[in-house]
Amino acid sequence: MFRLAPGTSRTTRIKRVLLNLENGINYVSLFLLALIPAVEVVLRTFFRTGIPDSSAYVYHLVFLLTFLGGALTARENRHLSIVAGNEHLPERLKGPVHIINSHLAIAILTAFVWSSLSFALMAFDGSARIGIIPIRWFILFMPIGFTGIAIRILHMSSSRTVPRIAAGFGFFSGTLLAFSSIYNLLFYFYPGLPLYFDTLLNQWYLLIAPVSLVLIIVLILSAGLGNQLFVVLGGVAYLLFARTGGALESIPNEAYTMLISETIPVIPLFTLAGFILSESKAGERLVSLFHGLFAWIPGGQIIAAVLVSTFFTTFTGASGVTILALGGILYVVLHKEGPFTEKFTTGFLTASGSVGFLFPPSLTIILYAVVARISVVDMFIGAFIPGIIVMVTMMLIGIVVAYRNKVATSPFNWREVRQGLRESIWELLLPVFIIIFYFAGITTLLETASLAVVYIAVIETVVHHDLRLRDLPGVAVKAIPIIGGVLIILAMSRGLSYYIIDAQVPNVLTEWIQHNIQSKIIFLVLLNIVLIITGCFMDIFSAIMVVAPLVIPLGEVFGVHPVHLGIIFLANLELGFMTPPVGLNLFLSSYRFEKPLNQIYTNVIPFFVLQLIALLVITYVPWFTTVLLQLFG
């Protein structure tokens, strides 16, 4: 329980209670999400029974976590956005642009409040339940979450009254945008609506078509000026549906359908496992072990840093988390206590943050497999050698630099290695544990992720005592802004993906490509360019949802193996994260190492070139992807 200082106002007390309640609901949801599948495995294995409706509870906990977690992400101001354009604006324009962005975001969120309320009432009747809980209760967390995000955007829009009113006017604008959903709600409660409501609805349809086109352009421009990506993606989808007379409830419906799928719960679970690792001293133990193993090799510290970064990115699913969590430790190892220059170290750490995307249990591979409707196992098998190529490329530059600068090495010390192995063995067993349980078919992917969370929580609290049990809620609350931010992007981008497919955009694009591009090589070159640019401007989860459905049919036309196409897709986006001037990892690195962005650009270029070479090898030599599939697929 928290204590309030004497004289604390009643308003402050209420705010603190509400904040603690919000944290508590998010934590309990994440805790149950991690625990239920693990308990299910135990009950099935030892007692041949299970928890009734356990899968449905888990899926709907993810749904709840998406929107309440999204509200918490807004509270921490952690929703993904592109700030590069905003940073180059004159100071006198930054304030007005921020108000316009806030107004747009509030308007779109308000429109989603109405459409999700309509969806909750029209899609499910009161008898639809999960156990004893009506499904509508879960669905209602969608408008609650959108409302919470909108209120927080308003709160952060400005400290001055007039600009805040201008931003707050977005609630009115969003209500106008959502008139068809409001009409549906009114009709649901009052079936005998007067005829003038029908007249108003017809007038709304006439007006919304030209207005939507303008708003879509404004929204896209706002994305480059710092507006939240999930707002832009969801807003564009909403306006496209409105412009064509589509049901606006389709977007909440698509979000719901996606979030209650079997694979999506894996994302928050592996992210939580990664955060537990990053909050413990696991990074220090692994650095110590790999240093002992490779210190006798010139560039051994680099090899150790690549392996540790790969390990963490694999589990968190976010290269930015690796940079933020391990950047400080590895900076000390490589520069302050090591032989490498600051320029080399910051460039290397910026580039190595995303190396782990191609190794199991990479969340990006899982999500791509779901979208492309191909085997997750095949994707993991196909990604293994390309992942090794990228990883070895990063190691080689360290070895070359060490040789050129005659960096001193240390004799191999078996005692140091043995001690490091003894201290970190439990963390090293985690990927082995995942591979055995999942690939041997003992547990599902969801159950494997759940057991991974339980396993690593026990190791870090009971075995190593790096964390106490009472620290776990704090770790969860740190993880939830990442989890909520990613899940709400997936939910909102699903609507845009659905519209793109429904409008037959992939078919039109495929026909155009067939008529204008005959060479497979030219197609792959263009694909590399487009995807690298996409990686600069979109996070990888949004890109998978929105861009992959466009690319997959094109790959079929040119005879690209589906798994190879997936690896090309992910490797390009990975490179986009470190592509100047707007790659996401560049901003995170600038923040973590407290260096000017221009300096980070310069430092990362050699590593960008090396990873580009690795990407070209992966793209134009499909054998590296398909050889293991031929043996084990």
Whereabouts are the PLM-identified features?
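Alpha-helical transmembrane segments and membrane-interface helix-loop junctions
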Residues: M1-F197, I488
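Alpha-helical transmembrane segments of multi-pass membrane transport proteins
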Residues: S127, I139, R164-G633
